[in-house]
Regions:
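A contiguous strand-loop segment
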Residues: 34-150, 170-312, 318-321
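C-terminal segment of classical bacterial N-terminal signal peptides
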Residues: 15, 22-31
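Bacterial N-terminal signal peptides that target proteins for export
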Residues: 2-17
Length: 327
């Protein structure tokens, strides 16, 4: 039997597990940064799937592990980062969590569950923060008044979902109805499926079922390339207007063959402000034996800002893929 393992490599705690820690250790990281990884079962020695993220927030930021019990009368979810509210439609599931310490959130115990697994075998890693471009923001801005965000993702998904697909469908419905308060990516899995959920703009989202023959490294980059069939409901779920909205607003982008390009439509273009993210992407590709070549694929650049936390970064010459196969 194959299993899916969430690996939350929390550098805040100094407990970097093999994949995430090694993927970023060779280059300096900046604050407010994460690096998300995925490794399909056909690429691992034990035939299992691994996923997770490094969380780089500050040198010392208290996290705690715990177990949220099942609640037969359901739960009411709310947030201190937005006006999001949601009430369970029935009993909730028991799940583990790795949360921010209550001292960081006005003594509330429910903030930022980040990673865990529930009694049904659904696991979650949340989140990888990304960003959207100005045209997407103008057309469909994030909704801080009601939108769901990192404060609640994992708690809602793990408390309410019996399968990974259920988690994707629930999160998608909440974004449809209430929006998101930040652009994020979340990985949701069970023993049968692993899904990557991406919040693209205020009410637009996409979720892709990940195959077992690919790897992925993403250090806070929202427009890493991928092709997806929006009509394939077995492997792709998304908001109803994911393509029609940008087409009507005039900012939709397409691949050379005419297929709608989700990542470039909503994501930001390559720029200096992402130089430290690209450093981590390059290091991750090297670690997973699919290296990029300096001079051909990227250049080392200096960060000359007065408040820079690292002196050098990198910029790629052209957009890179979200998914790849190791050498």
């Amino acid at each position: 039997m194959r299993f899916t393992h969430p690996v939350n490599t929390l550098k805040k705690l100094g407990c970097g597990l093999a994949f995430g820690a090694a993927a970023i250790m060779a280059m300096p990281t900046s604050a407010l940064a994460c690096t998300q990884i995925y490794m399909g079962s056909k690429l691992t020695a034990d035939g299992n799937t691994y996923y997770g993220r490094a969380e780089d927030f500050s040198p010392r930021y208290i996290k705690h592990f715990g177990i949220e019990p099942a609640h037969k009368d359901g739960s009411e979810y709310s947030s201190l980062e937005s006006g999001f509210e949601y009430k369970s439609k029935g009993a909730t599931y028991r799940y583990t969590f790795v949360r921010d310490n209550p001292s960081q959130w006005e003594d509330r115990y429910d903030a930022y569950s980040e990673a865990g697994i529930n009694e049904k075998g659904v696991s979650c890693s949340a989140t990888l923060s990304t960003s959207y471009n100005e045209k997407a923001e103008e057309a469909d801005p994030i909704t801080e008044e009601t939108g769901i965000g990192e404060y609640n993702y994992a708690s809602v998904i793990l408390g309410e979902s019996a399968t990974a697909r259920e988690g994707v469908e629930l999160l998608g419905s909440l974004v449809d109805e209430q929006g998101i308060c930040t652009n994020d990516q979340v990985i949701i899995a069970d023993n049968n499926e692993t899904w990557l959920f991406a919040g693209l703009s205020g009410h637009q989202w996409i979720a892709m079922k990940l195959t077992d023959d690919i790897a992925s490294v993403n250090p806070n980059i929202g427009n890493l390339n991928y092709k997806v069939n929006l009509d394939d409901t077995e492997n792709c779920l998304h908001s109803k207007d994911i393509q029609t909205m940008p087409e009507e607003k005039g900012f939709a982008k397409y691949f050379e063959d005419g297929q709608f390009d989700v990542a470039q439509t909503y994501g930001e273009e390559i720029s200096d402000k992402a130089m430290h993210s690209w450093s981590r992407y390059i290091q991750g590709r090297d670690y997973f034996m699919a290296p990029l070549a300096e001079g051909t694929d990227y250049e080392i650049v200096k960060d000359e800002r007065e408040d820079a936390r690292a002196t050098t970064g990198a910029l790629v010459h052209e957009m890179q893929p979200l998914f790849f196969q190791p050498g």
